[in-house]
Amino acid sequence: LTIRWVTYPSRQELPLLAESVQATLKEIGIKVDVNCSADFQSFLDSGEWDIYAGAFVCAPTGDPEYFFTTHCLDESSKNRGGYHSDKLEELEKEMKSTFDTDERAKLAVQMTQTILDDNAFIFASHLKMSIVSAKGVTGLEAHPCDYYEITVNLDKN
């Protein structure tokens, strides 16, 4: 058995994850051909892959719907593997018309459980990020979501 693994080098953890999987599966006789390329999109487009490992921010604005609409639905632009779930599509219809944050959170839990039950996605790592700034930068604080480091408190003296 050979698994064709596609990833890219611009996120430091992705090549390391590929190498770890490759070494671990080799121990049980499974070969993993790793293709780590900045041109990963060409490989995805060709369909000549079995596993695509990519990094993304699941909830950049704190709203749980983002991940599902970008990655998990029939019309999602990043649904690389062509995943489909009637249940998930129905839950998303409900999510679209639900505005209460507690209810949206409950729907998000159901949606998450659906993709986990289907083994549609494997969440394998978490990015370790360092923030470095030039001398004189003040008010820069790390935040779990990419968009919230730039605040009214950020300044350069």
Feature locations, PLM:
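Solvent-exposed, polar/charged alpha-helical surfaces in well-ordered, non-transmembrane soluble domains
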Residues: 16-19, 23-27, 42, 86-93, ...
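Periplasmic binding protein-like
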Residues: 5, 23-72, 108
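Short, solvent-exposed loop/beta-turn-alpha elements that line the ligand-binding surface or hinge
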Residues: 43-48, 68-97, 126-157
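Extracytoplasmic/secreted cell-surface and envelope-processing proteins
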Residues: 13-16, 43-44, 61-64, 133-135
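Alpha-helix N-cap/loop-to-helix boundary motif
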Residues: 13, 36, 56, 80-84
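Append "and occasionally in soluble cytosolic enzymes with long acidic Gly/Pro-rich linkers
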Residues: 1-23, 27, 35, 110, ...
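Bilobed periplasmic-binding protein-like "clamshell/Venus-flytrap" ligand-binding domains
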Residues: 1-9, 55, 99-134
